[in-house]
Amino acid sequence: MLSNSLCPRLTNSLILSKLILVYQLFIFTGALIMDKQKVNNNIVEEENLSKEKEIGGIKGLEPTRYGDWQHKGKVTDF
């Protein structure tokens, strides 16, 4: 059985080791949150870039998105 003089040291070291683990977890999750914010900022910046316009392309809605092409009144379906 442990003597009374060793118990406080043992409990203090256990508490300290648990605090260190909690602190490391806090730092790690904080780093993950910061990385996620950087990724979100990069996505927003890419969306804000001006898109190049097509020269001589089909006017109107995107045909590949809506599944058909219309040119001079004639419609072709994929």
UniProtKB/Swiss-Prot annotation:
Pfam families associated with the record: DUF1674
Family annotation (InterPro entries): SDHF4
Family as reported in the entry's similarity comment: Belongs to the SDHAF4 family.
Protein name: UPF0369 protein RP167
